[in-house]
């Protein structure tokens, strides 16, 4: 069973039809929408500020979600994939976004809807990724505009697949 821990009088609120892997950790002021999945060794730590996640968010294995005390909460929209080993910290991620494996998104960043942060990228503090952009690198920079094929073939496909994968573990 996942570690779901109340802290300072605030208990995580887990959305309907959400899968929590046995080694996932969810602490404090965390609110999740429905159809989310939190995978093995992922940590969602709402201890120093709040974390709000929309519907159909998948937080893949070993990812870390955190926020900044008295400054930056973490807000994640709907249909978002946070790749394996990613760190997402004190930022805003809108709907239909893919944060690639091993990426770091730092405080006060805004990732608008229908965007991709490529695997291994470092999105430095205060960066604004506009709607429909693909970013990558260290530090991350705009690579190109997203195509409809990339949006459907990656962003939506991965989010939908993780809803399916999580159903396998609930049986």
Regions found by a protein language model. Give the residues of each.
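N-terminal segments that cap or nucleate solenoid repeat domains
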Residues: 2-38
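Short proline/glycine- and basic residue-enriched helix-capping loop/turn segments at helix->loop/beta transitions
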Residues: 81
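Glycine-rich hexapeptide-repeat left-handed beta-helix
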Residues: 1-13, 47, 53-55, 61-64, ...
């Amino acid at each position: 069973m996942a570690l779901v821990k109340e802290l300072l009088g605030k208990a995580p609120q887990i959305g309907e039809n959400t899968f929590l892997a046995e080694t996932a950790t969810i602490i404090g002021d965390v609110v999740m929408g429905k159809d989310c999945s939190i995978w093995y060794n992922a940590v969602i730590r709402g201890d120093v500020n709040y974390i709000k996640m929309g519907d159909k968010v998948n937080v893949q294995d070993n990812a870390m979600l955190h926020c900044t005390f008295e400054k930056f909460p973490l807000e994640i929209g709907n249909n978002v994939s946070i790749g394996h080993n990613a760190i997402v910290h004190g930022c805003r991620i809108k709907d239909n976004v893919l944060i690639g494996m091993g990426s770091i998104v730092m405080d006060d960043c805004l990732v608008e809807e229908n965007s991709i942060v490529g695997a291994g990228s470092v999105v430095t503090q205060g960066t604004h990724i506009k709607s429909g952009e693909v970013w990558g690198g260290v530090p991350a920079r705009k690579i190109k505009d997203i195509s409809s094929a990339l949006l459907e073939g990656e962003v939506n496909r991965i989010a939908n697949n993780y809803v399916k994968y999580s159903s396998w573990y609930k049986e």
